[in-house]
C-alpha cells in the first residue's frame, strides 16, 4: 500500500494467477500440491522436525516469519477434523532468514547437523539492486548452497583435495572427518524472474494453497486456532489479577508465584 494502490492490485493479480493454476493444473504439475506432498513426505514420513525458508532478496526479509505464522498456526494441530487424536507428525517448525545472513548464522547446521532440515531457496533472475555484479555474486551463493546440500562431499574427495593442496598426512587424518558433508539434504528452489508485487502475490498464494493441501492430506482443519484462543482466555483472567492487590489468586502454584513476584517488583519500582 505504501507503493500505491495499483501495486496492491498487482499483488492480488499475482495471487489470482496461482489461484487459477491451483484450480486448473493437473496434480502432477500443480505447484501447491507438489510442495504439500514434499512437505508431508519430509515431515510425516521422514521425520524432519523443521523446515527453513531462505529468500535471497532483502525485500523478502519478513517472508520466513509470515510463513511461520501461516503454516504453524494453520496446521499445528493434533486432532483430525473427525475429532480423533493424531499419532503422526503434522507440521514442522518453520523458520529462516535472508540467505546471506543465514549463511553466516545457521547454514553450518543445515550442512552438517545430524538433524536434516528441508529448505526452500527463493531467488530471482533479475536484480532490483543497481549495484554492478552484486546479483551474480548473490545468486552464485544461492546455487552453490543448494548444490552443496544435495551432493555433499565424501571423505575420499576431501582427502584428495587436501592432498592436492600439499597438506601433510597427519593434518589430513585430523581434518578430513570434519570436512565431510553427507549431502542428500532436501531443498526446493523457487526462482522468479523478478521480485515485484505481482510475483510476491504469487509466492504468498503458492504457500497458502500448499498449506491448505497439507491440511487436507493430514485430515486436519487449517482454519481454526484453538490453542491460541486458550491462551487469550487465560490472559484475560491473569490481567485482572495483575492489576489487583489481593493476595488470593485463582491460579496454579507456579503461575501464582510468578504473578506475586511480578506484583512485588512492580510495587518496589513504582
Residue ranges, per PLM feature:
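Short alpha-helices
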Residues: 1-13, 182-226
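Active-site phosphate/pyrophosphate-binding segments
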Residues: 1-132, 140, 152, 181-183, ...
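Short secondary-structure boundary micro-motifs
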Residues: 27, 36-37, 172-175, 199
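Intrinsically disordered, low-complexity segments enriched in polar/charged residues with Gly/Pro
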Residues: 29, 176-177, 212-213
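Short, flexible segments with low predicted structural confidence
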Residues: 42-43, 171, 202-203
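Acidic, Ser/Thr-rich peripheral helices and adjacent loops at domain boundaries
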Residues: 130-170, 176
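Short, intrinsically disordered low-complexity segments
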Residues: 158, 166, 173, 184, ...
